[in-house]
């Protein structure tokens, strides 16, 4: 096992005030969901979860169809159900959103699409990105730059990408009527200013609202355990943990890198429940890491805050950033993120 102190990281800046203003508004639907939440008992974190597995629905689709979702950093949001949303209206939505972005730029608002504003908005379905047949189809929204040459029919580079999905979202699907489409997890790669403008259009069009989805240290520990438990044909990355040490005048970060086979051996030594991960096993796994680190460096990691986890399956940061690396476990990663998103909006 290898360990080292990482240089201080610059804290992520808060989202723009425009982004904040949009993502905290309460819609009539949110008020109804809040009413339902108050009438139901609090549901604690499940004491056990299944180890992520491959999805048959995903296997039935050409892997190249969603390969572009991998190895990119996505910012996470939770999303309340969309009112009167229709998959058959994608062409109309593309035109309306394109016009809305053009109008916002004409107002002088910050839109990061280039000076010539020669863009195209595209809505499309992401087949296979779901946990069960009952889950709504995932869909993708992209802002593309148009080619400047009339003879060129190829699309230009992707300026902004966002996708909406629901993976094993039964708990939310059971609480809303047929007028609503439940896609509680929204993932974005692109400028925050564009995210705010596109989010505003969705809010006005579908009576929904977005909220940044942070990942606390407790959930990062679960991710570390579940992803370490996954069987890999070959490991693509070192298993790494990053802890933040609050101190004055500046914070200190501690990075702890472990060979993935060593991490898997450690997990196997504490894992007793076939096919599942339990809270007790997660705690034991993390306690073993803390003990090993303290034995070598005399530092109590339990007094710090876990802020990032990286494995060959995926990496996640407490500020709501995720990067999915292994296509086999794409659905498994999204299932847990959907669970967190549903919990945030219920």
UniProtKB/Swiss-Prot annotation:
Residue numbers of Phosphothreonine PTMs: 45
Listed InterPro entries: CENP-L
GO cellular component, one term: inner kinetochore
UniProt entry keywords in alphabetical sequence: Centromere, Chromosome, Nucleus, Phosphoprotein
Modified residues (Phosphoserine): 41, 55
Transmembrane segments: none
Primary localisation category: nucleus
Subcellular location(s) of the protein: Nucleus; Chromosome, Centromere
Annotated family: Belongs to the CENP-L/IML3 family.
Complex and partners: Component of the CENPA-CAD complex, composed of CENPI, CENPK, CENPL, CENPO, CENPP, CENPQ, CENPR and CENPS. The CENPA-CAD complex interacts with the CENPA-NAC complex, at least composed of CENPA, CENPC, CENPH, CENPM, CENPN, CENPT and CENPU.
Protein task: Component of the CENPA-CAD (nucleosome distal) complex, a complex recruited to centromeres which is involved in assembly of kinetochore proteins, mitotic progression and chromosome segregation. May be involved in incorporation of newly synthesized CENPA into centromeres via its interaction with the CENPA-NAC complex.
Name of the molecule in the record: Centromere protein L
Organism: Bos taurus (Bovine)
């Amino acid at each position: 096992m290898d360990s080292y102190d990482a240089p201080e990281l610059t804290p992520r800046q808060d989202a723009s005030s425009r982004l904040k203003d949009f993502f905290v508004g309460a819609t009539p639907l949110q008020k109804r969901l809040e009413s339902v939440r108050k009438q139901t008992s609090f549901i604690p974190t499940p004491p056990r979860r299944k180890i992520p597995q491959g999805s048959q629905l995903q296997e039935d689709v050409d892997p190249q169809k969603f390969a572009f979702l991998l190895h990119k950093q996505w910012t996470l949001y939770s999303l309340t159900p969309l009112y009167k949303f229709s998959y058959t209206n994608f062409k109309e939505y593309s035109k309306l959103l394109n016009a809305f972005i053009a109008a916002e730029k004409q107002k002088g608002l910050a839109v990061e699409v280039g000076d010539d504003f020669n863009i195209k908005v595209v809505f499309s379905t992401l087949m296979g990105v779901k946990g069960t047949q009952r889950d709504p189809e995932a869909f993708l929204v992209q802002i593309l730059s148009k080619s400047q040459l009339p003879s060129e029919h190829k699309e230009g580079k992707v300026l902004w990408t966002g996708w909406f999905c629901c993976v094993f979202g039964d708990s939310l699907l059971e609480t809303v009527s047929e007028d609503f489409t439940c896609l509680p997890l929204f993932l974005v790669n692109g400028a925050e200013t564009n995210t705010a403008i596109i989010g505003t259009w969705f809010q006005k069009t579908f009576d929904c609202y977005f909220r940044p989805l942070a990942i606390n240290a407790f959930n990062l520990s679960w991710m570390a355990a579940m992803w370490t438990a996954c069987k890999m044909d070959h490991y693509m990355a070192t298993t790494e943990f990053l802890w933040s040490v609050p101190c004055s005048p500046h914070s200190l970060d501690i990075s702890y890198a472990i060979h993935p086979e060593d991490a898997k051996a450690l997990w196997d030594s504490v894992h007793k429940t076939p096919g599942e991960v339990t809270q007790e096993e997660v705690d034991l796994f993390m306690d073993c890491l803390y003990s090993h680190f303290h034995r070598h460096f005399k530092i109590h990691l339990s007094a710090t805050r876990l802020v990032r986890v990286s494995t060959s399956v995926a990496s996640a940061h407490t500020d709501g950033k995720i990067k999915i690396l292994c296509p086999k476990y794409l659905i498994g990663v999204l299932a847990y993120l959907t669970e967190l998103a549903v919990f945030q909006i219920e």
